[in-house]
Regions:
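Thiamine diphosphate
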Residues: 1-133, 138
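Residue-level marker of positions within ordered structural domains that often coincide
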Residues: 28, 148, 161
Length: 172
């Protein structure tokens, strides 16, 4: 059945369909709805962290334990989580993980403008950039397969248009 979804809902749906067991995030617009939606799936243990670094480290722990995990935060949160991100980038994964940063190149709901694609480049991470809600579902699912196949962390950075503004039909 087709259903209308925001990008944040679609990211959560993709993680659920990929078999994610653990989700962590620090709340902040425009990424809050990702964990809120993940928490509606009883198969996923979802928790708010006291900051973005702790959210990242919790997801690392889940991955090291062999669980598929996801961590999400707003764009400026990646500044706080950069230290564990760079360490994790060369550690590899036991259980697949996807890092989602809700970038805001146009300052729609945040105090500053930041484009986190440079973090993926600097950490030498594979990055997927969905263009609509259906791609959010599909790319998040594919990220787990790719990450586990190549023993690497995957990074996704959807734009505000994809996450919040457009409501695209999704097959989920």
């Amino acid at each position: 059945m087709k259903r209308l979804m925001t990008g944040d809902e679609a990211i959560a749906r993709g993680a659920y369909e990929a078999g994610v067991s653990y989700a962590s995030a620090y709340p902040g617009t425009p990424s809050t709805e990702i964990l809120e939606n993940l928490s509606t799936y009883k198969e996923i243990y979802a928790e708010w962290a006291p900051n973005e670094k702790v959210a990242m480290e919790s997801a690392i722990g889940a991955s090291v334990a062999g669980l598929r995990s996801i961590v999400s935060m707003k764009h400026v949160g990646m500044n706080v989580a950069a230290d564990p991100l760079f360490t994790w980038a060369y550690m590899g994964v036991n259980g697949g993980n996807v890092v989602v940063t809700a970038d805001e190149p146009g300052m729609f709901s945040s105090q500053n403008e930041q484009d986190n694609r440079n973090y993926a480049k600097a950490a030498k991470l594979a990055m997927l950039e969905p263009a609509d809600s259906q791609e959010c579902v599909d790319m998040v699912k594919a990220a787990y397969e790719l990450g586990e196949k190549f023993d690497c962390l995957l990074y996704t950075s959807p734009s505000p248009r994809d996450r919040q503004k457009s409501r695209m039909p999704s097959s989920a």
